[in-house]
């Protein structure tokens, strides 16, 4: 059939199983939006308040569903407004396709109105990017973009299409996309046999699971593996939910704000089996002392991660689901009762604690956890509230926690929550934010109200940039430079002005009724929770410090 380039873009999206697109129109992409008007029965376009919101929504949709998220923007500032969201997706390995339009090929390279070299701008933060100047290249490029976004280690791909291509016509033949086979060819039988030998020799094995377990769909295999080798399990922030957080062998998050049980346990283990994690600085602390008593096995789909941050004894490159499945089939059941008792003792001795006499962030998260039966999708922004959400909510399945881990993008959560709700309409969706993060992209409440998206935006308001202030308190002599936000902004009035219900909470007794009211509301709700400015996130590892030296408030008082 003879179609315009814009119609071909729509047909290619349908061919790839895309049902929802997030974006914002403009001059050079107007032909595509005209085509979307004719395809609106097949493609649901969500008009966000800002292109950054569109990129975060596409990211949230992808993380919540496991499918490729799609966002669109026009040339120039429209395209550059996607950059923060693309970078966020890149660092956290989210499959995303960003489609931008550029000026026509006849005026390309002449500093034309809203002309930006967006492929050059995004080259360091995409798996790959393309500029399409000839309509003959359009179909194979879009198909390739979706393949690259999903294949191996997922990530964002940008396709920039010149305006002439969106208007020209050519024949289009639909094609059924080929299933992407997991990468298995890079590891060997010898790799697996060596891993089994190391596991058999270990008396204190510890499993460290990252976001790669979730991307691979390997949670069931991880559960079987942990039971087979009789080992405790900890996770990265991105790996939350890869292993059921309510299971006895689960110890919590590892690293800077991980539990003492995880940090001390990894420091005491003799074999650390790392699956789909990249050993970021937030996890390892001082790399020279990290897991210094252990041999390390590193399973990852990306060969570039092996020995990048931590030198390992065995690197196995390939799909986590395939590798764990093969190991489970080959391994005999191991038993480590004394080691598990040692870990249980650490958990009992060092539980997560907070001041229960007053309203705090952890209390709010615990109430959300209780009232949703640990079944909600939790999105977050970045800071203290993010760590509380990671620590105090029980994630029982993959894709429950959606957060910016690697980039630490303030303003990520609200757009992500909107995208997550479109991807999983049957689950309650919360975005947990601090007052500093929320003000960055709070305009996306207008998107939620326009489409009546029933998300619950919780703003934990301490009137400061809480995490930065915590560092200033602990490491900068209490010199609070530009972290005080005690201003005249009324977030409840802002939310109401943007068409949302708003509830302010100032006492512990008001928290549960507010959450229940929000859950019963068919539409977006903001809950503003007023807490003290001196609340902190513990445990903590000092920047560059050893995870074996994790400390909490009691340790500081006893100094």
Predicted segments, located by residue:
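Hydrophobic, well-ordered secondary-structure elements that form the walls
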Residues: 296, 368, 380, 419, ...
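Active-site diphosphate/adenylate-binding microenvironment
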Residues: 6-9, 14, 19, 27, ...
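A short acidic, glycine-rich active-site loop
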Residues: 46, 181-185, 404-407, 477-486, ...
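Thiamine diphosphate
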Residues: 114, 450-543
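Active-site nucleophile and cofactor-binding loops and adjacent substrate-binding regions
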Residues: 24-26, 45-56, 71-78, 133-134, ...
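Catalytic phosphate/nucleotide-handling subdomain of diverse soluble enzymes
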Residues: 412, 416-454, 460
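N-terminal alpha/beta PP-like core and its mobile active-site loop of ThDP/TPP-dependent enzymes
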Residues: 1-331, 367, 371-374, 454-457, ...
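Phosphate/pyrophosphate-binding active-site segments
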Residues: 136, 197, 293-384, 508-512, ...
């Amino acid at each position: 059939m003879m179609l315009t380039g814009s119609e071909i873009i729509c047909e290619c999206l349908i061919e790839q199983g895309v049902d929802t697109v997030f974006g914002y129109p403009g001059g050079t992409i107007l032909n595509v939006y005209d085509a979307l008007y004719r395809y609106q029965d097949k493609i649901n376009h969500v008009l966000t308040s800002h292109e950054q919101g569109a990129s975060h929504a596409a990211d949230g949709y992808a993380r919540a569903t496991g499918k490729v998220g799609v966002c669109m923007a026009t040339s120039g500032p429209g395209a550059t407004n996607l950059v923060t969201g693309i970078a966020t997706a890149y660092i956290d390995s989210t499959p995303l396709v960003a489609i931008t339009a550029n000026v026509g090929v006849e005026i390309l390279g002449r500093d034309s109105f809203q002309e930006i070299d967006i492929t050059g701008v995004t080259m360091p933060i995409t798996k790959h990017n393309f500029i399409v100047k000839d309509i003959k290249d359009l179909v194979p490029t879009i198909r390739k973009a979706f393949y690259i976004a999903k294949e191996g280690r997922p990530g964002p791909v940008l396709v920039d299409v010149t305006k002439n291509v969106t208007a020209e016509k050519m024949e289009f033949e639909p094609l059924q996309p080929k299933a992407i086979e997991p990468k298995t060819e890079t590891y060997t039988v010898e790799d697996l046999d060596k891993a089994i030998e190391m596991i058999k020799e270990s008396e204190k094995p510890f499993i460290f699971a990252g976001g790669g377990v979730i991307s691979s769909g390997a949670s069931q295999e991880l559960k079987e593996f942990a039971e087979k080798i009789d080992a405790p399990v900890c996770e990265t922030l991105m790996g939350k939910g890869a292993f059921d957080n309510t299971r006895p062998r689960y110890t919590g998050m590892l690293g800077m704000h991980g539990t003492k049980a995880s940090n001390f346990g990894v420091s005491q283990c003799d074999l650390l089996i790392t699956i789909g994690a990249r050993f970021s600085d937030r996890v390892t602390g001082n790399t020279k002392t990290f897991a210094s008593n252990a041999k390390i096995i590193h399973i990852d789909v990306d060969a570039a991660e092996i020995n990048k941050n931590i030198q390992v004894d065995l690197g196995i490159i390939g799909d986590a689901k395939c590798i764990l499945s093969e190991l489970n089939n080959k391994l005999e059941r191991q038993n480590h009762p004394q080691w598990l008792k040692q870990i249980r003792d650490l958990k009992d001795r060092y539980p997560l604690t907070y001041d229960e006499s007053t309203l705090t962030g952890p209390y709010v998260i615990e109430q959300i956890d209780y009232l949703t039966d640990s079944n909600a999708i939790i999105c977050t922004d970045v800071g203290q509230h993010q760590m509380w959400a990671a620590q105090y909510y029980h994630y029982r399945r993959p894709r429950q926690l959606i957060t910016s881990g690697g980039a630490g993008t303030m303003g990520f959560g609200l757009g992500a929550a909107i995208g997550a709700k479109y991807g999983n309409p049957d689950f309650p969706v919360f975005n947990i934010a601090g007052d500093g993060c929320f003000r960055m992209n709070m305009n996306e409440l207008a998107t939620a109200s326009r489409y009546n998206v029933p998300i619950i935006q919780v703003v934990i308001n301490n009137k400061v940039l809480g995490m930065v202030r915590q560092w200033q308190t602990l490491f900068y002599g209490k010199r609070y430079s530009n972290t005080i936000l005690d201003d005249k902004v009324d977030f409840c009035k802002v939310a109401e002005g943007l068409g949302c219900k708003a509830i302010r909470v100032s006492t512990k007794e008001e928290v549960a009724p507010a959450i229940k009211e929000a859950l019963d509301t068919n539409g977006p709700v903001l809950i503003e929770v007023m807490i003290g400015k001196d609340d902190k996130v513990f445990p903590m590892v000092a920047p560059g410090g050893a995870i074996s030296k994790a400390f909490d408030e009691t340790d500081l008082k006893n100094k």
